[in-house]
UniProtKB/Swiss-Prot annotation:
Cellular component GO terms held in the UniProt record: 3-isopropylmalate dehydratase complex; cytosol
GO molecular function, one term: 4 iron, 4 sulfur cluster binding
Protein name: 3-isopropylmalate dehydratase large subunit
Function: Catalyzes the isomerization between 2-isopropylmalate and 3-isopropylmalate, via the formation of 2-isopropylmaleate.
Cofactor(s) needed: [4Fe-4S] cluster
Enzyme class, UniProt record, top EC level: lyase
Species this protein is from: Escherichia coli (strain K12)
InterPro entries, sorted: 3-IsopropMal_deHydase_lsu (IPR004430), Acnase/IPM_dHydase_lsu_aba_1/3 (IPR015931), Acoase/IPM_deHydtase_lsu_aba (IPR001030), Aconitase_4Fe-4S_BS (IPR018136), Aconitase_4Fe-4S_dom (IPR036008), IPM_dehydratase_rel_enz (IPR050067), IPMI_cat (IPR033941)
Amino acid sequence: MAKTLYEKLFDAHVVYEAENETPLLYIDRHLVHEVTSPQAFDGLRAHGRPVRQPGKTFATMDHNVSTQTKDINACGEMARIQMQELIKNCKEFGVELYDLNHPYQGIVHVMGPEQGVTLPGMTIVCGDSHTATHGAFGALAFGIGTSEVEHVLATQTLKQGRAKTMKIEVQGKAAPGITAKDIVLAIIGKTGSAGGTGHVVEFCGEAIRDLSMEGRMTLCNMAIEMGAKAGLVAPDETTFNYVKGRLHAPKGKDFDDAVAYWKTLQTDEGATFDTVVTLQAEEISPQVTWGTNPGQVISVNDNIPDPASFADPVERASAEKALAYMGLKPGIPLTEVAIDKVFIGSCTNSRIEDLRAAAEIAKGRKVAPGVQALVVPGSGPVKAQAEAEGLDKIFIEAGFEWRLPGCSMCLAMNNDRLNPGERCASTSNRNFEGRQGRGGRTHLVSPAMAAAAAVTGHFADIRNIK
């Protein structure tokens, strides 16, 4: 029987399945951070259980670390306790930890791929909703809750029901300057923020194949924002070239053998999906969200929509509420909306290609008066690479703040946050009410679009910036 990529990955990891029971899956990699793991380790301790496979468990600090100092006390009492607990737990249970002073420390979904922890064909879990990022490698990756974190630590398995399947095909080539962030925002604009609920999404089509691994990670990172369980891109030569030579990747003949298997991880000819969505890449322009969920998104050249234009009464009410929170009036051009802060970072857009794209816009320009702009590399290696290329100097000379790695302003769990009423052009993944700080107003954009907003003081079409 012809199978989708998701079905192949799922079936290959079933440890036990009985009639009327949820299948038990083997988990190849477990990524851990300071926020969702303390109670899980406490549970192990209470029952006298070890970590079943410490060699398949990797930990880092990211969510509530300071991006201005490596001092563990800098982000408040709760953050300090969580980070100290992680240090204690990893030491006690034999788990590798990339702490604040480790050169590999960074956002968990940046660290995993760049260290070769993430590989095609794997099942990967983490107590974090954006674990879907790793699906860019043709791995089945999804977020789990703290009780499930404990279960995986104890057994290296997890009960998981089968999801429905969705194919999202982006046909043709994207125009120059159109990024993976624009593509995925356009997709969510079409499906809505709940369009993928109950599904695992496979992204395909020429525009997807053209993306680098970093672009594919941006894409899969936001699969969760359309309600999907996970996102997938089938592995190909782009994938294999990225993985080769990384710290935890197979070496020599083992790598060749792995590639031979990874090449089978494609959806079979004739396999059927429960849902199919198609977009034309050439129609996608730079995207900016205007509301309070990622599906409320328009082209940078559009006007703020009028809630009355929505036929669905639920959508209409949602738009009215969103505009009130965002302090926007229907009909005004998006390019006239001024911003207060810019955040370039997060597990969506903090990799080296993202920073290069932002630096290209920032070079030779200055951050607009009254705007605070942060650039937060996703990991120690990304920061080192950017500095080797002189990107930090470009940003600093333009008036951006060059920070230490961490989740930063993506979420209000550390010192980087919005004040009430402040408007931010952000390369992160969520624009919910209060996500970046109580009363903060978030607009999701690509790194180049964020840099353009920083230097102009408002949203601007990067295609018009020479």
